[in-house]
């Protein structure tokens, strides 16, 4: 049996879960929450790989694999006019924030005052 994936720490849940070209495409590229977080840390905030990996509570090698995957998916979507959908992943939101609105993935809540730990308690409130 394979070892379970380590829960990645994220500090941002995007408000928009779908981005599409001007002419809507039926083909989608799915980015996980941790891939979006890696893009945010490395490209938007210009944090080095060591710092970004530490922020996400993962190794530098794992961070490198996540960021490479995210960049490849984004390039594919931009070049081929595909819709980008943000969904799922194996992550934990930083203390004081809620991630219980996600409908898929292995999200874990931290300090969510609306949630009792049930993964289905806020499914109707999708991002």
Curated annotation (Swiss-Prot):
Protein name: UPF0251 protein Ccel_0627
Coiled-coil spans in chain: none
Domain of life: Bacteria
Family, similarity comment: Belongs to the UPF0251 family.
InterPro entries: UPF0251
PANTHER family to which the protein is assigned, alphabetical: PTHR37478, UPF0251 PROTEIN TK0562 (PTHR37478:SF2)
Organism: Ruminiclostridium cellulolyticum (strain ATCC 35319 / DSM 5812 / JCM 6584 / H10)
Pfam families tied to this protein: DUF134
């Amino acid at each position: 049996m394979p070892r379970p994936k380590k829960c990645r720490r994220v500090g941002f849940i995007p408000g928009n879960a779908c981005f599409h070209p001007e002419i809507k495409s039926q083909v989608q590229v799915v980015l996980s929450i941790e891939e979006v977080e890696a893009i945010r840390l490395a490209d938007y905030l210009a944090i080095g790989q060591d710092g970004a990996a530490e922020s996400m509570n993962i190794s530098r090698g794992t961070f490198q694999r996540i960021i490479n995957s995210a960049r490849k998916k984004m390039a594919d979507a931009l070049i081929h006019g595909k819709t980008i959908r943000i969904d799922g992943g194996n992550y934990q939101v930083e203390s004081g924030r809620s991630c219980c609105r996600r409908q898929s993935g292995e999200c874990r809540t931290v300090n969510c005052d609306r949630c009792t730990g049930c993964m289905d308690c806020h499914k109707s409130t999708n991002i």
